[in-house]
């Protein structure tokens, strides 16, 4: 991911890393109780590029796969200082410094071994489900900026989503990160509006949004209906953040 997103001229890899770090922070906060962070989530972040698929965690978690959220919260690589603008109560804004934990750093490695990444996720989740057969079905969020160049991702996706717990099948949601302009296509129920075979293949790979996720998406003003899939094409930065939020925050509604 060495290209940029639209007019913002930000490296796509940096945008993805920033969004993932923000998501991990928010998930950890949601799981925080008086006695500490509860392990409502196990998290794995896989980076794929060039010829490799590997854990994208850095620091103390480097090389870790599925990791309890309490350990994720405890071991960021570092904590950066960010500046946010907040209302000053008098009609203006003030700059406020805030901590920003970093677990994942931006990387750009050329090729797109998506099949390898999906197969790695399948292996990780197969082992996790064997130990947690009654758990909530795992969710895989696949963020990609290019077509797979290591095989047929539809076949790999089907093997992944055939895994199931007692509560249902693994969910696979796909988001295409674009450097082109234009409105994203979000959570479509069919492929008629998609521009090409690549977009249609990502749509076919994607799971339908469960009812509670459709409800949450609708509350965020998305046009969703029965059959809508966890798929966003030609994503911009706003859609990326909202996609990650819907893919995880909806779990709290159950």
Summary of predicted features, one role per range:
Residues 1-254:
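Acidic, low-complexity intrinsically disordered regions
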């Amino acid at each position: 991911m060495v290209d940029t997103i639209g007019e913002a001229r930000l490296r796509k890899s940096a945008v993805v890393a920033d969004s993932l770090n923000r998501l991990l922070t928010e998930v950890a906060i949601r799981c925080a109780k008086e006695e500490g962070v509860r392990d409502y989530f196990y998290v794995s972040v896989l980076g794929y590029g060039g010829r490799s698929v590997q854990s994208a965690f850095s620091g103390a978690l480097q090389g870790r796969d599925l990791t309890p959220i309490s350990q994720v919260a405890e071991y960021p690589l570092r904590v950066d200082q960010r500046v946010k603008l907040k209302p000053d109560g008098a009609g203006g804004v003030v700059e406020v410094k805030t901590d920003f934990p970093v677990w994942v750093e931006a990387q750009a490695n050329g090729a797109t071994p998506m099949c390898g990444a999906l197969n790695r996720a399948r292996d990780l989740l197969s082992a996790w489900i064997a130990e947690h057969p009654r758990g909530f079905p795992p969710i895989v969020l696949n963020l990609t900026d290019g077509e797979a160049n290591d095989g047929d991702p539809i076949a790999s996706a089907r093997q992944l989503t055939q895994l199931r717990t007692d509560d249902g099948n693994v969910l696979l949601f796909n988001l295409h990160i674009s450097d082109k302009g234009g409105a994203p296509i979000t959570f479509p129920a069919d492929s008629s509006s998609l521009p090409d075979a690549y977009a249609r293949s990502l749509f076919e790979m994607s799971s339908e949004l469960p009812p509670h996720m459709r409800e949450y998406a609708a509350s965020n003003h998305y046009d969703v209906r029965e059959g809508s899939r966890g798929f966003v094409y030609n994503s911009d930065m706003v859609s990326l953040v909202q996609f990650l939020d819907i893919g995880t925050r909806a779990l709290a509604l159950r």
